[in-house]
Amino acid sequence: EILDIFKITPKYDLDIMIERQTLEHVTSSILMKLSDILAKEQPDMILVHGDTNTCLSASLAAFYKKIPIGHVEAGLRTDDIYSPYPEEFVRRTVDSISSLYFCPTINNADNLIKENISKDGIYITGNTVIDTLQTTVKKDYTFKEPLLNRIDYNNKRIIPITAHRRENIGVNLENICNAIKTLASKYPDAHFIYTVHPNPAVKNTANRILEGIDNVSLLPPLIFTDLHNLIARAYFVMTDSGGLQEEAPSLGVPVLVLRRETERPEAVQAGTVKLTGVEYKNIVRDGRMLFDNKSVYDKMSNAVNPYGDGKASRRIVDAIKEYFKNL
């Protein structure tokens, strides 16, 4: 779907997705298939993005063939290798073998310098997701998810929710869902839209606690454009996701982060994001604060977005040109 938005036709499809596969299986499948492709194509550089298993596997495949790596969204850190898991390990590993580092913020660049990475390869670009929002968010937008077209956005306070991280499955997710249930009861004028990950451990908990509540909708994961346009119409967002901590503030929407730490402290420092955590009482407290305290809400929604001006992609292209020009 993202490829369609930007009219990109991939030359290769690794076709590795199967249900219930382990991290080890995903990593090895990508590594083996991509290794063959790199041997055939012999690229001058590969670009990897973020902190997924695909990012890790592609970086390893390139490193084994001594192909330079450019890491988009480099330098994010929580300082706890198991939180988020396995993303923190992925980005530390990828940054240890990259040649170019495209950092969303100054803080990310500083993290790399502290790890003795040369300044020569570090570029502060902003985040590419801000570039994307300029294409995906539209004033007159028809959602692909039918339910989203039936919502009264003018008279309802819309609260999109994502909560699916591995480290939150279990008691933490139950706390999150019970807090949503409490807030939904206290604020009948709000509509809580939880996009539920298909992982049975997530789906079963969400259904057990939240199914049947009038102002809570449980939806499958949304396509990219639906999610962005829903956020643009939201009152605030509740999430344990990384990307939404950047996307929502860019649209003037406050965020409650349902995690104990974040690799994106810039938004917390700027005041657009609050690190709420995973305790029931804290989630309810911070939710009520945004519903009831207009001055706090206005301060969060009007804070300056720290993640760039929508020109990150151009800066990345220019940095790559400079790299090869100086070889």
Question: What is the predicted role of each segment?
Answer:
Residues E1-Y194, N199-L327:
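Nucleotide-activated sugar donor-binding and catalytic core shared by glycosyltransferases
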